[in-house]
């Protein structure tokens, strides 16, 4: 199975997500409007699918969902390399390979959900931008998994950049620049 074969953006999983988005609510749910684009991690997506502050809220939500899904897809391809190599052998048990891939996708989705929710604790209290949310994602994951062996943070940074989500107030998009820093002096305890 090649990377293209396992591209989640063109699989049944994405179709299920879109179907769920259509049926989950009235109007334009973000999942219904998500447009995922395959490509190199540093290649921007079509301008029509990039972040634009003038877009309607659901369309902006779709950009955020697409960026996160793009990052998850890249990590999935990385983490399943050995399973795909096994699948390429002539007598690989396809049912077992499929089960391994499904289990990895489920585990990865749970890990990404954990990062996405934990990041909320690191966001400013009001008027959060997508760039600030990326900083919160990077910080939350760095606190939980300091060494990042599977490149989750790198995948998130590349995906947000691909979808045109900018981060104000940082010199570059390195992990060190994106991490939220603690206060320079300790804050007094709250009584």
Question: What residue spans do the PLM features occupy?
Answer:
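Zinc-dependent metallohydrolase catalytic domains
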Residues: 1-191
């Amino acid at each position: 199975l090649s990377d293209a074969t396992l591209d989640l953006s063109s699989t049944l999983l994405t179709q299920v997500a879109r179907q769920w988005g259509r049926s989950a609510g009235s109007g334009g749910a973000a999942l219904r409007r998500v447009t995922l684009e395959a490509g190199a991690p540093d290649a921007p997506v079509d301008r029509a699918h990039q972040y634009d502050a003038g877009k309607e809220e659901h369309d902006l939500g779709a950009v955020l969902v697409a960026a996160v899904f793009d990052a998850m897809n890249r990590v999935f391809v990385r983490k399943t390399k050995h399973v795909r190599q096994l699948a390429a052998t002539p007598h690989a048990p396809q049912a077992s390979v499929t089960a391994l891939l499904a289990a990895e996708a489920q585990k990865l989705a749970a890990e990404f959900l954990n990062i996405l929710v934990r990041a909320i604790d690191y966001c400013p209290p009001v008027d959060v931008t997508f760039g600030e949310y990326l900083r919160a994602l990077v910080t939350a994951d760095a606190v939980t998994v300091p060494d990042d062996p599977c490149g989750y943070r790198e995948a998130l940074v590349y995906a947000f950049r691909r979808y045109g989500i900018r981060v104000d107030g940082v010199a570059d998009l390195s992990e060190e620049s994106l991490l939220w820093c603690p206060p320079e002096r300790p804050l007094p305890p709250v009584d």
